[in-house]
A protein has these predicted regions:
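N-terminal post-signal-peptidase region of extra-cytosolic proteins
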Residues: 3-4, 33-41
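Flexible, acidic/glycine-enriched loop-and-adjacent beta/alpha segments
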Residues: 40-91, 151-155, 161, 168
């Protein structure tokens, strides 16, 4: 595993904006995985923070980086049903996967995946010894893939609702939180279309 002192849990890149002489935005440039707009935790609605934690890592504020109960639950399910799809990754592990183990999408064997997961678990514990939960959650919310090329909650709020993250209502916060489970499948642009004339009455 990488040395914990050498790892960086900060997001890897951000979008760049070009403006004309009058200050109007004329172009947005973003490399793959870099369409993110950083925000601080206090700018993110508490409802969204709570919803993401409830969906992604319900024991986030209780564990030390790894969720032993979640690991045991996923292990029992795998042994009894043969279904290895249930994950037990914590928010801290997911943050490491996205910002440190960036080649995880090219893993081709169970051994590669298992090796990476063990390293993630080790580093998650080390990171939580030196980093507070709020910093971890803030970086996670600025990093998470929310579909349609949006990484982080501010980019997603702009993409889906044409709003800043702090202006989202409860329903919009719930929608963003729900995307985390399957960013392509739950893309609101694909799920919600204009009502038909019949629907409009």
């Amino acid at each position: 595993a990488p040395d914990v002192d050498d790892i960086d849990i900060m997001p890897l890149g951000y979008a760049t904006f070009l403006y004309d002489d009058a200050g109007n935005q004329i172009r947005k440039l973003a490399a793959p995985d870099s369409n993110r707009l950083p925000v601080t935790l206090d700018q993110i609605p508490v409802d969204l923070q709570h919803a993401v934690v409830a969906i992604e890592d319900e024991r986030f504020y209780e564990h030390n980086g790894i969720d032993v109960k979640g690991i045991l639950r996923a292990g029992m399910k795998a042994l009894t049903t043969g279904d290895f799809s249930e994950g037990a990754s914590t928010i801290t592990q997911q943050l490491l996967k996205n910002n440190v183990f960036t080649n995880w999408t090219s893993e081709s064997t169970q051994l590669e995946r298992f090796t990476r997961k063990i390293q993630e678990q080790y580093l998650a514990v080390q990171v939580e010894k030196k980093t507070d939960k709020d910093t971890i959650l803030e970086n996670y919310l600025n990093t998470i893939n929310l579909g349609a090329g949006s990484y982080g909650v501010q980019a997603a709020a702009r993409q889906y609702f044409d709003k800043d993250i702090w202006d989202l209502n409860l329903s919009e916060c719930a929608t963003l939180a729900g995307i985390t489970q399957a960013p392509t499948k739950y893309n609101p642009c694909l799920l919600y279309t204009s009502p038909s004339p019949r629907d409009r009455g």
